[in-house]
């Protein structure tokens, strides 16, 4: 399933209907008074959160959204009908911004939450409203006002419990395919994952949603690589699983350096990101050199002032996966580690500046 992260749409609320100029035309009443009805109010444009939606895909193809105008007033004191609100359904986690100013309008998360993004125009008054003792036959009525019109930017932040972060090609897509039924595109080159993938993991009698966040690189906080486009998805995750490649990293890189570089990017984008609980997983330990690098990293991180829980895993053989998922489940549901486990308490990593 493709996740559309950001779309720009144009919304136009309905105009108010015009008031009517009309007169009573009844038998035996030669000089009937004014009888022009009021115009109906224009329809609002309303965003409504729909928990059944998970993407903004529909708005990629239909970007113009116009609500109906109110009907004009009529004779015999008949008012025009109000326009029915135009409801645009969006998934939970949709952030609404003004396209012209960049101003944050709302962050929509709760099911059935409603937001009026364009207010309909007010209906005009008919001439019956303007009759006075000195002017009993007003020949004018009020026009309806125009409905609001604006451009909006909708951004989707995935609502996942756990975010899997790391350098491109660290094994994130392989991991999520191993622990859930998700089947992301996987290949041996960076940026295979161009959109976030979601998987549901069953843990004991509970479940949680995992998001495979596309690869981050140095400079991501400034938009490098796939930068800002994906860092926003990390913000709502409660726990981060940080993957580092144990075998064959590029020249000049190491598992420890990768870990610190990504945490630095998280901190530069938003200080609260680097403070989220993290579990570090060294991948590809089916390769001997990766296992050795992982053991070395585990010992080094155990000596830190704030120890970081380190797991050695292989998505190919499945080794270490149950222990990793157990650690994630405990972190989410604040359970104590099982007796005899090797895991250490979760640390909140500090990015090195």
UniProtKB/Swiss-Prot annotation:
Its EC number is 3.6.5.-. SUPFAM superfamilies: Obg GTP-binding protein N-terminal domain, P-loop containing nucleoside triphosphate hydrolases. Its cofactor is Mg(2+). Residues 160-333 form the OBG-type G domain. Residues 1-159 form the Obg domain. GO terms for biological process: ribosome biogenesis. Transmembrane segments: none annotated. GTP binds at residues 166-173, 191-195, 212-215, 283-286, 314-316. Keywords: Cytoplasm, GTP-binding, Hydrolase, Magnesium, Metal-binding, Nucleotide-binding. Mg(2+) binds at residues 173, 193. It is found in: Cytoplasm. HAMAP family: GTPase_Obg (MF_01454). Belongs to the TRAFAC class OBG-HflX-like GTPase superfamily. OBG GTPase family. This is GTPase Obg. It comes from Anaeromyxobacter sp. (strain Fw109-5).
